[in-house]
Design a protein with these regions (language model features):
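C-terminal or mid-to-C-terminal helical accessory/interaction module adjacent to the motor/catalytic core
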Residues: 189-267, 271
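Conserved alpha/beta enzyme-core scaffolds, especially Rossmann-like or related mixed alpha/beta domains
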Residues: 1-11
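Electropositive nucleic-acid-contacting surfaces
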Residues: 274
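Residue-level marker of regulatory loop/turn positions in helix-turn-helix DNA-binding domains and
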Residues: 9, 56-57, 99, 240-241, ...
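Small/polar loops that bind or transfer phosphate-bearing groups
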Residues: 8, 122-124, 143-144, 167, ...
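Phosphate-handling DNA/RNA-contact segment within nucleic-acid enzymes
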Residues: 13-162, 175-176
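Alpha-helix initiation and N-capping motif
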Residues: 10-14, 23-29, 107, 152, ...
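Conserved phosphate-handling catalytic cores of large alpha/beta enzymes
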Residues: 147-225
Length: 274
């Protein structure tokens, strides 16, 4: 809890507003910081009386995750619902000091770790906390967005390689493909961790621990893309194998000779072509 500065927001519409106003902050300052939402006054209608201008806490009944930059500055907050309500995750909107495209969650911890061989990029705050709790180093998460070029550049400052460790659902798999494109555009080597049984990172490490995590297959970008293409084609038919081979050709053409030879051998085994 102390390592990540975790906290909680009470189930109240204005607990934070009242506490911060008591310290001298105005509603305008709290709104600019992304901590409250202000609703303008509403005139009376036939169905209800007039309503005054009101301020509501942004985070209510949520576990709170401070978003801290690599220099130790608290820039924003993320909140996870304690009860089964939507949205499950809620983040501070962009403010004069915070842009979710530019940073990653746990950047402050990455800076403290020395000689990292790779950064493990996950989808959510809970995955970061869970993997770190089990002893995995170099873990961080994007801030409710797909990986951006700016975030990739930041990760490159901490380690020479990025391991994508996303959920196995369709959204997670799509995010992996986009992430690989971004990392390759920035010249950053990448791998994709292959979780079994449809488990997400948190579920897997709670089942298999750090020892199991360290043994996970780390797929090259081309191996991952070929696997995705294979799932989209029927390799029991000649037409499916031909379409699959053609789709893979676009992936293989930019590989180094040794990598291309290995990938071609795998493709020959899968399709029967030579």
């Amino acid at each position: 809890i102390r390592k990540f500065g975790l906290g909680a927001a009470p189930n109240s519409w204005d607990a934070l507003t009242r506490a911060m106003q008591a310290k001298g902050y105005t509603t305008e300052e709290l709104q600019m910081a992304g901590l409250i939402v202000i609703k303008d006054a509403e005139e009376a209608t036939a169905d209800r009386p007039a309503r005054p201008r009101r301020a509501f806490d942004m985070f209510r009944n949520r576990a709170i995750f401070p978003i801290i930059d690599q220099y130790g500055n608290v820039l924003a907050f993320g909140g996870r619902a304690i009860e089964n309500v939507q949205p499950k995750y809620l983040n501070t909107s962009d403010t004069p000091i915070f842009n979710k495209r530019l940073g990653v969650y746990a950047a402050n911890l990455l800076r403290k770790e020395r000689h990292l061989e790779r950064v493990v990029l996950v989808e959510g705050y809970m995955d970061v906390v869970s993997l770190t709790q089990f002893g995995v180093t170099g873990v961080c998460a994007t801030l409710g967005t797909a990986l951006t070029n700016e975030q990739a550049k930041l990760l490159k400052r901490f380690a020479p390689m990025v391991y994508l460790s996303y959920d196995g659902d369709s959204a997670g798999q799509h995010a992996i493909l986009r992430g690989l494109d971004i990392l390759e555009a920035e010249g950053i080597p990448a791998r994709v961790l292959d979780f079994p049984d449809g488990l997400d990172p948190d579920e897997f490490i709670r089942r298999d621990g750090k020892e199991g995590f360290d043994k996970l297959p780390a797929l090259t970008p081309q191996a991952y893309r070929m696997r995705r293409l294979r799932a989209e084609h029927d390799l029991t038919t000649q037409e499916g194998r031909t379409a699959y081979a053609k789709a893979c050709a676009a992936i293989l053409r930019n590989l180094e000779p040794v990598e291309m030879e290995n990938a071609l051998q795998e493709l020959i085994v899968q399709t029967g072509f030579s």
